[in-house]
C-alpha cells in the first residue's frame, strides 16, 4: 500500500532536536540500531512479525516538503543550515529485517538499521509505529485462528478499530495470520484481502417481517445466502424463518442455504439447538457462524468445554484492538557507533535485567533440527562470526555464562533471519504478495513447537548468545557498572 500522504514528519519531536545536535557535531558518523521487543503480548510464547511493507514505503519516500520545512522554521528551534540540510535529506543507509509473517521472539532484532546518525534517528518513530501495531494485531489474529482449529475466522473489527489506518492495516495482517477474510472493503481493494459480509439487524428491521427480509435477501443472493437469525428470537423465529425461506424458495430453485449467523445469546446452547433444527430439516450442509465479543479463550472454551456446534467465527474488537493486551512494546536501541572508522559496540544498562541490551552489530540465526525441521533456538552472533554446522554449537543464556546448551555437530542447520531490505539507500528487496506472506507465515509457524504456541504458560523459546557476544556483553557490563 503506497500511502498517498507524505508522512515524513510522523516522528517524535526529539528526533529533530537530537538531529540538530548531531548536525552541529558530526552528522556523517554511522550508527547501528536494533528494533526489538521485550515481552510477548497476552503472556504468549511468540509473535508474528508484520509491518515491513509499510516500513519500506516510509523509508523509500522519506523527504521533507517545503510546507514541512516552513512549519519547522516557524517553531524557532532550528538553524537555517539544519533546515536546508533537512530539505534535501534522503535515506542512504542499510536496513536488514526479518521477512513479514515470521514467528519471532523477545530480545532479537526484528529490524537492523545502519545509517548516518541523523537518518537512523529520524526513522525511529515510523518504524516502531508500523511494526508495533501490525505485529500486535497479527499475533492476536494468529492466536484466534489457532483456537478455531481449522474453522474459518473472519475479521469484523473495523468499527471498533482505533482509526482508519488501524482498521485497514489490521485487516491486512489478520489475513496474513490466517483469517479467512475481512469485512473491511478498503482492505480488499488495497491489498486483495477477501471481503466478507451479509446483513445487519437493521436490514431485517427495515422489512415488515423477518421472513420478508430473509426472502428478499435469498432472491438477491440465492447462491451465497447466509442469514442473521437473532434479531428477534434465534430459536422461536430466526432459525424457523431461515429454514422456511430455504424450503419455500432456495431449494425449489436449486440452491442451498449457505449459513446462518448468531450474534447474541449463549453461543454454545443456541448453536446446538440450531444445528439440531437444521439437521432435522435436511440441511446438514448449512453452516453456523457466530460473532459477539469472541477471542481465543472464548473460542477454545466453546469448542472444547461446551461442545458448541459452530463452523466459523466472526471476531471484531478483541482482534482489531488486541483488547486484552493492547500495546506491543517494540523499542529501538543503538547498539554500535562509528569512531575513527570503526564500529564501536554500545550497550544500554538498566537495573531491570530485561532492559539490558545486546551490544554490537549482530546476526540473527535460527537453529533448526536437521531431523525434524523444527526450530531449536534463535542465536545472536556478532557480525563477523561464522557457524560451522559440522561442529558442536554452544549457545548461552543472555546474562549467564553457566546457563548454556550444546547442540551436537551435524544435527542442526542454521538460517540467517535478517535479510537485506535497503543497501546504500536503495531498495534491494522484492516485496512478496499478500498471499505469499500468508503462505510463508503458515509454513514458518509449523516449525515452532506446540508447547511454545499454547495459550497458558507456554514453554519459553530460547533466544541465546554466542560465547563471543556474551563475553562482550559481560565485559561492557563490568566496565560501566
What are these regions (language model features)?
Residues 31-87:
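N-terminal, Lys/Arg-enriched amphipathic/low-complexity engagement segments
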Residues 70-71, 139-143, 157, 453-460:
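Short coil/turn segments at secondary-structure boundaries
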Residues 1-30, 39-41, 77-78, 83-92, ...:
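Buried, small/hydrophobic-residue-enriched core segments of structured protein domains
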Residues 95-101, 414-417:
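Short acidic, Pro/Gly- and aromatic-enriched capping/linker segments at domain boundaries
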Amino acid at each position: 500500500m503506497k500511502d498517498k500522504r507524505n508522512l515524513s514528519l510522523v516522528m517524535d519531536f526529539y528526533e529533530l532536536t537530537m538531529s540538530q545536535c548531531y548536525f552541529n557535531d558530526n552528522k556523517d558518523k554511522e550508527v547501528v540500531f536494533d528494533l526489538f521487543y521485550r515481552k510477548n503480548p497476552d503472556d504468549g510464547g511468540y509473535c508474528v512479525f508484520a509491518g515491513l511493507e509499510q516500513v519500506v514505503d516510509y523509508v523509500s519516500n522519506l523527504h521533507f516538503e517545503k510546507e514541512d520545512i516552513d512549519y519547522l522554521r516557524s517553531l524557532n528551534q532550528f538553524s537555517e543550515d539544519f533546515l536546508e540540510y533537512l530539505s534535501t535529506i534522503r535515506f542512504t543507509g542499510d536496513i536488514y529485517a526479518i521477512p513479514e509473517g515470521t514467528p519471532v521472539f523477545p530480545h532479537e532484532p526484528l529490524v537492523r538499521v545502519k545509517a548516518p546518525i541523523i537518518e537512523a534517528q529520524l526513522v525511529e518513530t515510523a518504524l516502531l509505529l508500523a511494526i508495533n501495531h501490525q505485529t500486535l494485531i497479527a499475533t492476536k489474529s494468529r492466536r484466534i485462528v489457532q483456537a478455531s482449529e481449522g474453522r474459518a475466522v473472519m475479521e469484523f473489527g473495523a468499527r471498533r478499530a482505533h482509526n482508519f489506518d488501524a482498521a485497514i492495516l489490521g485487516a491486512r495482517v489478520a489475513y496474513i495470520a490466517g483469517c479467512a477474510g475481512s469485512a473491511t472493503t478498503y482492505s480488499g481493494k488495497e491489498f486483495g484481502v477477501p471481503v466478507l459480509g451479509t446483513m445487519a439487524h437493521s436490514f431485517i428491521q427495515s422489512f415488515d417481517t423477518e421472513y420478508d427480509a430473509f426472502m428478499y435477501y435469498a432472491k438477491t443472493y440465492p447462491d451465497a445466502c447466509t442469514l442473521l437469525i437473532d434479531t428477534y428470537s434465534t430459536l422461536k423465529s430466526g432459525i424457523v424463518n431461515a429454514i422456511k425461506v430455504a424450503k419455500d424458495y432456495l431449494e425449489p430453485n436449486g440452491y442451498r442455504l449457505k449459513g446462518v449467523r448468531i450474534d447474541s445469546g449463549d453461543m454454545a446452547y443456541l448453536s446446538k439447538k440450531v444445528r439440531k433444527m437444521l439437521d432435522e430439516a435436511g440441511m446438514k450442509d448449512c453452516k453456523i457462524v457466530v460473532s459477539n465479543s469472541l477471542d481465543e479463550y472464548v473460542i477454545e472454551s466453546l469448542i472444547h468445554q461446551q461442545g458448541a456446534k459452530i463452523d466459523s467465527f466472526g471476531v471484531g474488537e478483541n482482534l482489531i484492538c488486541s483488547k486484552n493486551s493492547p500495546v506491543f512494546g517494540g523499542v529501538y536501541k543503538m547498539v554500535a557507533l562509528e569512531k575513527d572508522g570503526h564500529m564501536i559496540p554500545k550497550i544500554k544498562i538498566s537495573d531491570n535485567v530485561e532492559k539490558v541490551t545486546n551490544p554490537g552489530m549482530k546476526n540473527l540465526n535460527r537453529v533448526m533440527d536437521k531431523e525434524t525441521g523444527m526450530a531449536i533456538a534463535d542465536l545472536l552472533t556478532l557480525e563477523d562470526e561464522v557457524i560451522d554446522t559440522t561442529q558442536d554449537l554452544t549457545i548461552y543464556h543472555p546474562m549467564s555464562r553457566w546457563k548454556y546448551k550444546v547442540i551436537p555437530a551435524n544435527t542442526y542447520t542454521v538460517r540467517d533471519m535478517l535479510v537485506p531490505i535497503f543497501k546504500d539507500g536503495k531498495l534491494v528487496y522484492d516485496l512478496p504478495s499478500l498471499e505469499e506472506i500468508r503462505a510463508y507465515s503458515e509454513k514458518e509457524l509449523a516449525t515452532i513447537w506446540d508447547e511454545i504456541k499454547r495459550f497458558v504458560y507456554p514453554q519459553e523459546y530460547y533466544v541465546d548468545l554466542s560465547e563471543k557476544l556474551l563475553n562482550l556483553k559481560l565485559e561492557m557490563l563490568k566496565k560501566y557498572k
